[in-house]
Amino acid sequence: MQFNTYIYMLLFLPVTILGYFVINKFSYFFAKIYLAAVSMFFYAYAGLPGFQWLVISIIFNYLVVLLMKRMHNKVILWIGIIFNIVLLFYFKYTNFAILTINDLLHKSIPLTKMVLPIGISFFTFQQIAYIVDSYRGKLEEHSILDYINYVTFFPKILMGPLVSPNVLLTQFHDESKRKISSQNMVDGIQMFIIGLFKKVILADTFAKAVAWAWRIGDFKQISSMDIFLVMLAYTFQIYFDFSGYSDMAIASAKMLNFELPMNFDSPYKAYSIRDFWKRWHISLTKFLTEYIYFPLGGSKKGEARTYLNTMIVFLISGIWHGANWTFILWGILHGIFSIFDRLVEKFRKNIHPALQWMATFLTINVLWLLFRANSIGEWKHALSQMLRFQSTTISDGLLNVFVLPETKVITKVFRLYFFEGNIRGFWMLIFYLIGFILCLGFENAYRRKYKQNVVTAIFYALLFVFILTCIGSESVFVYFNF
């Protein structure tokens, strides 16, 4: 079950909210049991084959914390951490390791047929955070019910945001959240619709442009301009897809009176790669900083150690994202550019902000192309074809992916025949303009002040109905497989 499905929006979420607040009137304890039950159902519905591993992981980690609280033994801490890492590596990287061995040693070891538990990268990191914070004395002992809710809370279990244990557990103990809040409900509904718009209207449309290029399969068959536009399309796709999901996750929690942390802060406004990582997937950056970078010494042990720690963090980030050398190289390159930013920080003041932004944005685009590529060789091939500038022609196939049934209706309603007939690629231009305007001209949805009035209600209601009519076959979120 994903946020952009009818069953979630029109059945699961309304029933969950209604049931939670009705049960809260009688018992906060039973309301938490209800919340745990619906969260477990949500996960099982999304990926039943991996459900038992989630349960095993929860039971093992909770027992580790109980033992650690009583014995305060660092060995138990490491047993818990190693268990989580081994579980993650077993499911996510076993076949990658086999393929690598086969390539290097010319072997033919068969691949395993295991099913990757959905969201394992996220719920594994969440539980490592809980174990470490418990060892550090930052957490009180919590009931198994609270722990289950912390790990499985349905708005964030599949793709985050990653939440600090204290942030969420404190809210589970706050009985003031038992009553429905009209402000939270309005904020949540409006934020959810914004996230849904990002995913269904923007991300899924840009995804069609990206899929068009990869469907052709050979970048020699398309022009340099095509490759550049597809690269830019993926930059927009991954942002609107993942930030749209985060908006819907935060909104779903808000309607239940829970606050999840902001995950994006207009990342494409960044003036450097370091600035980008303060704005992109913020919850992952905070996790890697607190649980890896700082324990390694952070920036307090000299420049060489700082650069080494930075590279370790970005290498782990790359590995965490996926089992492919493309992700590993993507992480390494982000680490190198982050170190470069540190080295030239004093000189950057002399460079015009517009040039800083442009250099950063182009770098991010090139690295996203690597993120999307099936292999490093494919990425290099795409880059070389793009940088040859052999043709500025835009293929009709690429232009046509932006002409949708919905755009035809808009053309008819607003009489846009002149523009559509005289501007080649009119709708592609519109989508790219919307992408830039939303990324660079608007504040983050998390920071937006939502209004309660009739006009706003009508606008969001109409927008929601329009989006519902645009949902075709279920499209998977980009980070769903991470």
Label the predicted regions.
Residues 1-435, 439, 447-481:
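Membrane-embedded transmembrane alpha-helical bundles that form the catalytic cores
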